[in-house]
Amino acid sequence: MKIIDIEAWDRKTPYKNFVRYTNPIFSLAARLDVEAVYRRSKRTGRSFFADFLFLVTASLNRVESLRLRINEKGEVVLYEQIAPSFIVMQENGVIATCRTEFTLNYEAFYQTVRRDLEKKARMESVQEEFNRKEEPDVFYTTCLPWLDFVSMSNPYHYEDASASSIPRLSWGKFVKESDGHRRLTFDIAAHHALLDGKAICDAFAVMSAALEEADAFYEDPKSVLDAICHKLGIQDKL
């Protein structure tokens, strides 16, 4: 983790402007072609959710601005790696949050997600989970597989700058379109003091490219993402 010197930061002016806003959150939504991942998940008997979550988390970790957070002291910090914290629907219909540590080892991540999902789904009480203050080195993630929506809004506690600095990732039901490919809407909401629309566009570009190379990606995610980011000119600067 690295603390950013605001006074020496290129984003000093927009940061100081947007951090004062009552609502500093903005979001962008776009369609993603998930056909290759869907086919692979079907072919291998794997969970589409876990497979897609791995690709999303790996891709977004490559966009430096999406790893920036505001900590409890009001400092801007850059994390080396971000983990997904996603919503689980329990057997009784009540939602719970589930953080899974991230690794670029696909098999290890997949097995951890499946284990965490099953464990959380069986928990009788989640009150403690919702009350616990966690480190902001996560992406808050939610999936609504029942609806092919156009955009998404998320709840925020705007007085808590640290929690509000955590990006929200949302996606809906995938549908087969006229060309035979399955697509879904993916929404990214982020704190405008930390990043602009270009960073989210970069995130969509990396995800889209990884989705096109799904088979190669799951075999060697680092090499595929290295090549994608080199081609797109996406690199860490801080």
Protein language model features and the residues they cover:
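Domain-scale detector for complete catalytic domains at protein termini or as standalone homologs
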Residues: 1-19, 23, 36-38, 57, ...
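Helical lid/core segments from catalytic subdomains that handle acyl or acyl-like groups
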Residues: 90-149
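Flexible, Gly/Pro-enriched loop and linker segments at secondary-structure and domain junctions
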Residues: 1-29, 49, 127, 135-177, ...
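Acyl activation and transfer enzymes in specialized metabolism, enriched
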Residues: 37-64, 184-205
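Small-residue-rich loop/turn and linker elements
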Residues: 66-99, 127-137, 221-233
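Active-site-proximal acidic secondary-structure segment that organizes catalysis
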Residues: 107, 119, 163-219
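Acyl-group handling in specialized metabolite and lipid biosynthesis
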Residues: 26-28, 37-44, 93-107, 195
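Gly/Ser/Thr-rich phosphate-binding loops and adjoining beta-strand/alpha-helix segments
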Residues: 19-51, 67-84, 138-141, 163, ...
